[in-house]
Curated annotation (Swiss-Prot):
GO biological process: aspartyl-tRNA aminoacylation
Classification via InterPro entries: Aa-tRNA-synt_II, aa-tRNA-synth_II, aa-tRNA-synth_II/BPL/LPL, Asp-tRNA-ligase_1, Asp-tRNA-ligase_1_N, Asp/Asn-tRNA-synth_IIb, AspRS_core, GAD-like_sf
Subcellular location: Cytoplasm
Keywords: Aminoacyl-tRNA synthetase, ATP-binding, Cytoplasm, Ligase, Nucleotide-binding, Protein biosynthesis
Domain of life the protein comes from: Bacteria
Chain positions covered by the region annotation Aspartate: 200-203
Name of the molecule in the record: Aspartate--tRNA(Asp/Asn) ligase
Record-marked site positions (Important for tRNA non-discrimination): 33
Length: 590
């Protein structure tokens, strides 16, 4: 028999009345009623109310002085609660345990975090004492949710015939967009392993090895700055790769997995069909490659309406190659001037010169700084294109296309929030497809890959040889939910001649490609199947399901905003003997 407990703290019911039981757990709450002290005993599973009375002075004195969160084992008799004290919010709310003996397993010191309180604490306190923070229901439930989500994902993948395979953690550096975490080799002096940013090359090699459907709950490591939806250092993804598939095959596999997870673990509605939006349209209509479709506002291009107009600022910008984007603001025409001024100031904080705007007071009256420069036909066209009705306003931004998209997107987001337009209690998924294959690096004055260098260009070798590189699209795709990118994927480039050509456009010689990716190029010489994959982020999925604003809320032991583990004290200095063993020397920054 277990000496610590006969039952868990969520188990006891009326059918256990008059039984002698043993329970163990943490002292969650104490209520001193003079001659009686009530204690809520908590374990992982729930809470049971204990009753201590002063008839046994030794036990009573112990519990009187014992601090909250001390760990105890008790024996006692289960009794029914008085009807007036039944707690229907607890599974055990109809009973209590009259304590006859107690053993203090470990006594707690004064708590830096009140476990039973909803009080907010600083992130430094929470992460330094994460073992206490994890005792709080909200944080604990997030971690339990994460476990359940991963279990359900594994079931889904196995049911579809996928094989779970672990890939190496110590590998070589790869050019996947972020900085690597490097591990010095003790044996091979001057050489380093890299922690994988993703299992990209390994999962492709698995396809070349003849495996048909691979998945892994994969740890990934990227030396990136923190954001609300990105934890520095380490994250996990559902890594997937399949042979003999097209882009549509990937969509058909992963959509049901996402729908199942979000339906099973949330009461929010979910769109059962994921619309497909090209990267071009996402940037044009939403000002972001991560469009939040809960926001009904749609940006429109009104460059041609302002071309050759009397509004000289925009007309001059257009002649210099700039564009004009319009962001509708419903039911704001009668808002005070301060409303419009605040949006102009907001745009300036982003780096824009400002915003123009027109208020459509009624069907025949338009006001604002720009309205007087536009004739009726131009105003009517704005109303038509932007779906404007009487009482609405429109904001305008004029910049080069990339900046115009950014500024318009931020204004769209701000208006959606301020005007309470964001649809609540729903998950709005979409695919973003047709990403550019290359981009121009203005700083380096060179062409580089836009995203994944291992993806297949649309049009294959012919496109690489005959098209402007900046016009070539890739078989790359993202899943976006509520404005958060939760997955990226691609159909891979499995043909060496296409790979060499693509890398040559980005400035790599054949010899450089063979040296950098020797395993992949060697493998592709022995029969590589067409293959593709995707990798939804576990942390972001759980963050959305838990409805928390920060990804660190769903990670058990996260790094802080500065990439520090305050609990374990890392990163930390290494002693000189260890450095010498690794042939390393620390150069102090001046």
């Amino acid at each position: 028999m277990n000496v610590y407990r006969t039952h868990l703290c969520n188990e006891l019911r009326e059918e256990h009345i008059d039984q002698t039981v043993t329970l163990s757990g943490w002292v969650y709450r104490k209520r001193d009623h003079g001659k009686i002290i009530f204690v809520d005993l908590r374990d992982h599973y729930g809470i049971t109310q204990l009753v201590f009375n002063d008839s046994d002075t030794t036990i009573f004195q112990l519990i009187t002085t014992l601090r909250l969160e001390s760990v105890i084992t008790i024996k006692g008799i289960v009794k029914a609660r008085d009807s007036s004290t039944i707690n229907e919010t607890l599974d055990t709310g109809s009973i209590e345990v009259i304590v006859s003996s107690i053993n203090i397993e470990t006594a707690s010191e004064i708590l830096p975090i009140n476990i039973a309180s909803m009080q907010d604490y600083s992130e430094d306190i929470r992460l330094t004492y994460r073992f206490l923070d994890l005792r709080r229901d909200k944080v604990k439930n997030n971690i339990i949710l994460r476990s359940k989500v991963i279990t359900e994902i594994r079931k889904s993948m196995e049911n579809m015939g996928f094989i779970e395979i672990q890939t190496p953690i110590l590998t070589s550096s790869s050019p996947e967009g972020a900085r690597d975490y490097l591990v010095p080799s003790r044996i091979h002096h001057g050489k380093f392993y890299a922690l994988p940013q993703a299992p990209q090359l390994f999962k492709q090699l698995l396809m070349v090895s003849g495996f048909d459907k691979y998945f892994q709950i994969a740890p990934c490591f990227r030396d990136e700055d923190a954001r609300a939806d990105r934890s520095p250092g380490e994250f996990y993804q559902l890594d997937i790769e399949m042979s003999f598939v097209t882009q549509e095959d990937i969509f058909n596999i992963i959509e049901p997995v996402m729908i199942n997870i979000f339906s099973k673990f949330s009461n929010k509605t979910i769109n059962k069909e994921f619309p497909k939006i090209s990267y071009h349209d996402a940037m044009l209509y939403y000002g972001s490659d991560k469009p939040d479709l809960r926001n009904p506002l749609v940006i429109q291009d009104v460059t041609e309406i302002f071309r050759d107009s009397e509004f000289k600022i925009f007309n001059s910008n257009i002649k210099q190659g700039m564009v004009v984007r319009a962001i509708p603001a419903p039911n704001t025409a009668h808002n005070p001037r301060s409303f419009f001024d605040s949006k102009i100031e907001f745009a300036k904080t982003l780096g824009a010169q400002g915003l123009g705007y027109i208020t459509f007071i009624d069907d025949s009256l338009a006001k604002g700084p720009i309205a007087k420069f536009l004739d009726k036909d131009r105003l009517d066209n704005i109303k038509l294109i932007c779906n404007i009705k009487a009482g609405d306003s429109v904001f305008f931004v004029s910049e080069i296309a990339d900046k115009a998209a950014l500024f318009a997107g931020e204004v769209r987001t701000l208006l959606g929030k301020e005007l309470n337009l964001i649809e609540e209690n729903t998950f709005k998924f979409c695919w973003v497809i047709d990403f550019p294959y290359f981009k121009y690096d203005h700083k380096e004055k060179s062409i580089n890959f836009f995203h994944n260098p291992f993806s297949m260009p649309q049009g294959g070798l012919e496109a690489l040889e005959n098209q402007d590189p900046l016009n070539i699209l890739a078989y790359q795709y993202d899943i976006v939910c509520n404005g958060i990118e939760i997955s990226s994927g691609a159909i891979r480039n499995h043909k060496l001649n296409i790979m060499y050509k693509a890398f040559s456009i980005a400035g790599y010689t054949k010899e450089m490609v063979d040296e950098k990716f020797k395993a992949l190029t060697r493998a592709f010489k022995f029969g590589a199947p067409p293959h593709g994959g995707i990798a939804p982020g576990i942390d972001r999925i759980v963050m959305l399901l838990a409805d928390v604003p920060n990804i660190r809320e769903v990670i058990c032991f996260p790094l802080n905003q500065s990439g520090e583990d305050l609990l374990m004290g890392s990163p930390s200095e290494i002693d000189n003997d260890h450095l010498k063993l690794l042939s390393l020397n620390i150069i102090k920054k001046t």
